[in-house]
């Protein structure tokens, strides 16, 4: 590892594991600036259901890449990488260490490994695709994508014309599918990265925390928050923002699917599944140091020792 490279810290972990609390403590003790690595916290007006840091927490530890988009907008992994690299560069220029905190593992992976260079947008091809969609409908365009790139078609909904159009455009420009191109790694992250994951030792503790968080969300006005989104004319259930756990289940409730208690139960179950996927991903992560959610002092000491060791080299 080249010690001339600037340092960066990754603080990963499943939902409800205590990442924000630990990050705030780190901000108090070290010259770090926080960057959110969370595909839900990017959205404005989605505060309660995403467990977004509150005003007091943000005063103690400002987070970059929070509240940058309207829920009607999409945000790609490539856009996150571009924005995060820009923020990291700015933090390093201030003589500080970027602390990236969140649970969107795909974002971390893209940062570490880079992304394959995709062809630039072509206005003529994009216009051609949009013209076809006007004639045939986006469902038919999605069927086209299924034929050429079933993996991308599985991820991209017919009601997401921005991403659907881009996937078709990439194929028509390059002759290669989005799936093929994204399997090619790009430029690696030019930083010395200290990678940590925080989680309780017992799975039951994660489940308890998730249930407690959901209960607090409901008491804090989560139903009203989702209702205000539901009443907008420009949002629908297939947008990435509304597919976030908790929001999807409440949206279904407003659509007449089951009772409020059903929605809460489904939301808790979906959040548990998310945490399980995050932990599974982290268990296969290389060069990762695990921290115990129930021992914050020990976690702080572990990170401090790592930083002190690097500074002494």
UniProtKB/Swiss-Prot annotation:
Cofactor(s), names only, from the UniProt record:
Mg(2+)
Q: What class of enzyme is it?
A: transferase
The yes or no answer to whether the keyword Hydrolase is present is no
Which GO biological process annotations does it have? tRNA modification
* Keywords recorded for this protein, A-Z: ATP-binding, Magnesium, Nucleotide-binding, Transferase, tRNA processing
Q: Which Pfam families match?
A: IPPT (PF01715)
Q: Where does substrate bind?
A: 15-20
Q: Which SUPFAM superfamilies match?
A: P-loop containing nucleoside triphosphate hydrolases (SSF52540)
Recorded GO molecular functions are: ATP binding; tRNA dimethylallyltransferase activity
**Catalytic activity annotation:** adenosine(37) in tRNA + dimethylallyl diphosphate = N(6)-dimethylallyladenosine(37) in tRNA + diphosphate
Q: Where is this site: Interaction with substrate tRNA?
A: 104, 126
Location of region: Interaction with substrate tRNA: 38-41, 162-166, 243-248, 276-283
**Disulfide pairs?**
none
Top-level taxon of the source organism: Bacteria
- What is stated as this protein's family in its record? Belongs to the IPP transferase family.
Q: What does this protein do?
A: Catalyzes the transfer of a dimethylallyl group onto the adenine at position 37 in tRNAs that read codons beginning with uridine, leading to the formation of N6-(dimethylallyl)adenosine (i(6)A).
Description of how the protein assembles with itself and partners = Monomer.
HAMAP family from the UniProt entry: IPP_trans
The entry's protein name is tRNA dimethylallyltransferase
Q: Which organism is it from?
A: Aliivibrio salmonicida (strain LFI1238) (Vibrio salmonicida (strain LFI1238))
């Amino acid at each position: 590892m080249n010690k001339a490279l600037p340092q960066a810290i990754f603080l990963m972990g499943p939902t409800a594991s205590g990442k924000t609390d630990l990050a705030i403590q780190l901000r108090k003790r070290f010259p770090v600036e926080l960057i959110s690595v969370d595909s839900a916290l990017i959205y404005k007006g989605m505060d309660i259901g995403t467990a977004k840091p509150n005003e007091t927490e943000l005063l103690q530890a400002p987070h970059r890449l929070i509240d940058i988009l309207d829920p009607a907008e999409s945000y790609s992994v490539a856009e996150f990488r571009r924005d995060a690299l820009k923020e990291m560069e700015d933090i390093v220029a201030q003589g500080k260490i970027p602390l990236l905190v969140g649970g969107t593992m795909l974002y971390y992976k893209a940062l570490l490994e880079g992304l394959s260079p995709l062809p630039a947008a072509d206005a003529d091809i994009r216009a051609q695709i949009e013209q076809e969609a006007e004639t045939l409908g986006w469902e038919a365009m999605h069927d086209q994508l299924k034929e050429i790139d079933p993996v991308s078609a599985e991820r991209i909904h017919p009601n997401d014309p921005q991403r659907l159009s881009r996937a078709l455009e990439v194929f028509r420009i390059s002759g290669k599918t989005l799936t093929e191109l994204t399997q090619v790694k790009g430029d690696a992250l030019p930083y010395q990265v200290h990678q940590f994951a925080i989680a309780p030792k017992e799975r039951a503790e994660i489940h308890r925390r998730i249930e407690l968080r959901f209960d607090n969300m409901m008491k804090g006005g989560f139903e009203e928050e989702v209702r205000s989104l539901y009443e907008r004319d420009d949002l629908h259930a297939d947008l990435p923002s509304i597919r976030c756990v908790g929001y999807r289940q409440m949206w279904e409730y407003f659509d007449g699917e089951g009772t409020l208690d059903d929605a809460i139960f489904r939301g808790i179950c979906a959040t548990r599944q998310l945490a399980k996927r995050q932990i599974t991903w982290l268990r296969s992560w290389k060069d990762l140091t695990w921290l115990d959610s129930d021992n914050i002092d020990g976690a702080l000491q572990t990170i401090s020792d790592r930083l002190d060791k690097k500074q002494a080299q």
